[in-house]
């Protein structure tokens, strides 16, 4: 989803690079690369990227035990040289600012997908990587269950095609999305879908949802999830699962708004689109001046 969002801002895509091997890229020509996302899978071979890369930092994210691998003196110097750094969350912005790096809170590029022009007739409920969440029977019945987890045996082109098809499916046929996935929630909000999100509101990875006025519903406790899994996944218990969803879910999950309205993020979307276009234009201008 993040790559699809980035490609919207480019006139064309000449090359694609392995996110985890940017340090070792060796090209005769320089390539502008939108650096949105998390780059700590393999920081040694990723950062700092090679001189063949002209980075546009927007939606950049730091999180986890490998964060310090991207805050070495060499990396800090790289960030200062190629700033400003647009950050997906306030915590990343603060970490960079503490190092004297020019940074700003951009949010994520996946909020820039165009809003759909019409809502579907008899739209579908999509439950995305939320099968352990107890859901009311009225929503569960007829819902489509989806996962964003894709086996590594599929190549990047297949994964990109699947992501595009999923986004089109949500946009064209969805009436509601229930998910635990940030990069399902944000694109769906962007295209105009109502979203019910479950997660940890204290987690900086998803903190931008609060700034978009998205309710972050706490995950049900492990005992409730265990009971739900037992009555929901074992075939002989399915009738009990239906009763559980009808009777118990409205009681135990009453803190959830099961009928949310779409959230208007027009202002945030336009601001990020303008900022991203400006950053790209600056990099293009800089690259052309270096050539001349």
What is the meaning of each model-derived region?
Residues 1-292:
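Active-site anion-handling motifs in enzyme catalytic cores
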């Amino acid at each position: 989803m993040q790559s699809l969002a980035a490609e919207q801002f480019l006139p064309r895509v000449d090359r694609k690079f392995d996110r985890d091997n940017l340090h070792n890229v060796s090209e005769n020509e320089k390539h502008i690369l939108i650096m949105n996302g998390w780059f700590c899978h393999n920081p040694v071979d990723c950062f700092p990227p090679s001189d063949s890369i002209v980075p546009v930092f927007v939606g950049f994210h730091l999180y986890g035990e490998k964060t310090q691998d991207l805050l070495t003196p060499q990396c800090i110097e790289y960030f200062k040289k190629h700033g400003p750094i647009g950050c997906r969350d306030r915590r990343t912005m603060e970490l960079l600012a503490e190092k004297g790096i020019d940074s700003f809170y951009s949010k994520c590029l996946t909020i820039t997908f165009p809003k759909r022009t019409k809502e579907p007739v008899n739209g579908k409920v999509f439950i995305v990587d939320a099968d352990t969440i107890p859901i009311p029977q009225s929503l569960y019945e007829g819902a489509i269950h989806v996962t964003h987890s894709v086996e590594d045996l599929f190549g990047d082109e297949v994964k990109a095609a699947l992501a595009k098809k999923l986004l089109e499916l949500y946009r064209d046929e969805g009436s509601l999305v229930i998910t635990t996935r940030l990069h399902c929630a944000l694109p769906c909000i962007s295209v105009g879908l109502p979203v019910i999100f479950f997660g940890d509101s204290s987690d900086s990875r998803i903190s931008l949802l609060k700034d978009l006025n998205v309710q972050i519903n706490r995950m049900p406790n492990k005992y409730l999830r265990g009971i739900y899994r037992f009555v929901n996944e074992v075939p002989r218990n399915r009738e009990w699962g239906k009763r559980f969803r009808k009777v118990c879910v409205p009681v135990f999950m009453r803190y959830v708004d099961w009928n949310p309205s779409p959230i208007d993020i027009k202002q945030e979307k336009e601001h990020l689109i303008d900022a991203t276009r400006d950053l790209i234009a600056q990099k293009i201008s800089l690259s052309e001046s270096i050539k001349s």
